Every structure is written in C-alpha cells, then in structure tokens.
C-alpha cells in the first residue's frame, strides 16, 4: 500500500463539477492499493501517515505531525501509484488490487483516519476527479508498507 503525502495549505476534490471533499492546512494523501494489501497494512500506513512529522515546530524544524499541527487530511484514491514503470513507455497496472478490494481498503484507511480523531475528507473512489491543492514547501513524501 502506497501513500503519496503532500503538505498543503488547502486542497479540494471535485467530481462532475461538484465539490466533494475539501480541507484547509494538512495533508493530501494520494492512496494506491496493491495486490496483497490488507486491513493490517491499511492501519499501519494510516498510523505512519498521521504520525509522520512533516510540519514545522517553533524553530522551523519538521517535528510535528498532522494532529500536532491542527491539520486535516484529504484522502484520494489513485491506482496509478501501483503502476509498474520499469519497462517500456506505457505503465502496467497488474500490481494494483482488484477494484472491489481496493475500494474496501481505501474505505478502511479513510475510516481509520477518522477514528483517530483527525478531520478527514475523501474523494470518490474510481471517479474521474479534479484535485486542487496548494503544496506547502513543497513537502512531498512517498510512504509504503
């Protein structure tokens, strides 16, 4: 399971010109679910994302996690993160989880974020989405479990 996290000052997601998720300062989490992923991996990745210290403290050092910073999380499914790009000029998607399993684990991950007490917005699984963000830094990390 892969999370591409970006520290943002704000982020939003639209489907069919309708706003469906929006946050202020916090983390945009692009989530890719791979074959073999399970609830345990989703929970581990959630804990890692929410605990990852990417926000600045009073001294300007990245010592605070999203909770400590008072931020929110926007979780957006992105199956292309599971792409195999090693060969050729076209990505392969055989490493990605089947859609029904990916949706189940995406929901599990999002629910785990909410259960932790973090304000969590989401995109719409498998929809054609337009994601807007203002990357703060820029600060972007690839996390994988």
Swiss-Prot record:
Highest taxon above the source species: Bacteria
Catalysed reactions, as listed in the record: glycyl-tRNA(Ala) + H2O = tRNA(Ala) + glycine + H(+); a D-aminoacyl-tRNA + H2O = a tRNA + a D-alpha-amino acid + H(+)
UniProt-listed InterPro entries: Daa-tRNA_deacyls_DTD, DTD-like_sf
Annotated domain remarks: A Gly-cisPro motif from one monomer fits into the active site of the other monomer to allow specific chiral rejection of L-amino acids.
MF annotations from Gene Ontology: D-tyrosyl-tRNA(Tyr) deacylase activity; Gly-tRNA(Ala) deacylase activity; Ser(Gly)-tRNA(Ala) hydrolase activity; tRNA binding
EC number of this enzyme: 3.1.1.96
Full protein name: D-aminoacyl-tRNA deacylase
Renumbered ranges of motif Gly-cisPro motif, important for rejection of L-amino acids: 137-138
Gene name for this UniProt entry: dtd
A single BP term in Gene Ontology: D-amino acid catabolic process
């Amino acid at each position: 399971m892969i999370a591409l996290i970006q520290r943002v000052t704000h982020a939003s997601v639209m489907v069919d010109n309708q706003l469906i998720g929006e946050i202020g300062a916090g983390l945009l989490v692009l989530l890719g679910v791979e074959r073999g992923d399970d609830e345990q991996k989703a929970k581990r990745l959630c804990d890692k994302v929410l605990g990852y210290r990417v926000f600045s403290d009073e001294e300007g050092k990245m010592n605070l996690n999203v909770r400590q910073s008072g931020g929110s999380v926007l979780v957006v499914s992105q199956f292309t993160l599971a792409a195999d790009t090693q060969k050729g000029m076209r990505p392969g998607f055989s490493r990605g989880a089947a859609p029904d399993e990916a949706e189940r684990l995406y929901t599990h991950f999002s629910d785990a974020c909410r259960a932790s007490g973090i304000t969590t917005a989401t995109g719409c699984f498998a929809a054609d989405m337009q994601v807007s963000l203002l990357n703060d830094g820029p600060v972007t990390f690839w996390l994988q479990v």
